């Protein structure tokens, strides 16, 4: 229930941000701006707690946001952040930014592929993953979100939406173990 209510609050703000971006030809700029915000929030649990705390004065939140984003985000995007503070929705900032990016990808026929690898991928490997995902999905382009997990031992796991393609050594060993455990 909580997730549904949260989603119902996030979607209209993300759509409004996308509409603003499109009307002023700022979709790419807002994508960068939302990425910056997501990076700031991911790097600081204190910032997340500060913004989410309803007891903190809204003006203090605005000042912190201005200081963190001065000359880094477009003025319209900063105004949007101030609006979220005024409407007491700043606690939804990360979700709104993520949803904005998802809406923009959908609009541009770009899919997000979450790639987990045992080691850092080379440029050639990244290109191969992008081409494989394009073939699988029919998307115009692919955005990669890469994470490193040494426990995979080797290979990659690619997640696109609800589809998972497990080409990891750990996955192969698990499948082999399951097949060997079955009676003949």
Swiss-Prot record:
Which Gene Ontology terms cover its molecular function? proton-transporting ATP synthase activity, rotational mechanism
Which InterPro entries has this protein been placed in?
ATP_synth_OSCP/delta_N_sf (IPR026015), ATPase_OSCP/d_CS (IPR020781), ATPase_OSCP/dsu (IPR000711)
Q: Where in the cell is it found?
A: Cellular thylakoid membrane
Taxonomic superkingdom? Bacteria
Recorded GO cellular component terms are: plasma membrane-derived thylakoid membrane; proton-transporting ATP synthase complex
State if Lipid biosynthesis is listed as a keyword. Answer: no
Gene3D superfamilies in the cross-refs: N-terminal domain of the delta subunit of the F1F0-ATP synthase
For membrane topology, the record states: Peripheral membrane protein
Main location, first listed in the record: membrane
**Which keywords are on file for this protein?**
ATP synthesis, CF(1), Hydrogen ion transport, Ion transport, Membrane, Thylakoid, Transport
The record's subunit annotation is:
F-type ATPases have 2 components, F(1) - the catalytic core - and F(0) - the membrane proton channel. F(1) has five subunits: alpha(3), beta(3), gamma(1), delta(1), epsilon(1). CF(0) has four main subunits: a(1), b(1), b'(1) and c(10-14). The alpha and beta chains form an alternating ring which encloses part of the gamma chain. F(1) is attached to F(0) by a central stalk formed by the gamma and epsilon chains, while a peripheral stalk is formed by the delta, b and b' chains.
The record's similarity note reads: Belongs to the ATPase delta chain family.
| Stated role | F(1)F(0) ATP synthase produces ATP from ADP in the presence of a proton or sodium gradient. F-type ATPases consist of two structural domains, F(1) containing the extramembraneous catalytic core and F(0) containing the membrane proton channel, linked together by a central stalk and a peripheral stalk. During catalysis, ATP synthesis in the catalytic domain of F(1) is coupled via a rotary mechanism of the central stalk subunits to proton translocation. This protein is part of the stalk that links CF(0) to CF(1). It either transmits conformational changes from CF(0) to CF(1) or is implicated in proton conduction.
Q: What is this protein called?
A: ATP synthase subunit delta
Instruction: Name the source organism.
Output: Synechococcus sp. (strain PCC 6716)
Organism placement in taxonomy:
Bacteria, Bacillati, Cyanobacteriota, Cyanophyceae, Synechococcales
């Amino acid at each position: 229930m909580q997730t549904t209510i949260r989603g119902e609050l996030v979607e209209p703000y993300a759509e409004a941000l996308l509409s603003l971006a499109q009307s002023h030809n700022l979709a790419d700029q807002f994508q960068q701006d939302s990425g910056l915000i997501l990076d700031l929030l991911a790097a600081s649990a204190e910032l997340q707690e500060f913004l989410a705390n309803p007891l903190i004065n809204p003006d203090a939140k605005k000042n912190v946001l201005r200081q963190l984003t001065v000359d880094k985000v477009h003025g319209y995007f900063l105004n949007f952040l101030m609006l979220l503070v005024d409407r007491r929705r700043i606690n939804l900032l990360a979700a709104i930014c993520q949803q904005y990016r998802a809406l923009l990808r959908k609009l541009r026929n770009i899919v997000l592929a979450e790639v987990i690898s045992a080691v850092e991928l080379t440029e050639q490997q990244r290109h191969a993953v992008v081409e494989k995902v394009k073939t699988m999905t029919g998307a115009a382009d692919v955005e990669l979100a890469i994470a490193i997990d040494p426990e995979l031992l080797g290979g990659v796991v690619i997640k696109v939406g609800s589809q998972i393609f497990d080409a990891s050594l750990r996955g192969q060993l698990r499948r082999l173990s399951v097949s060997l455990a079955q009676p003949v």
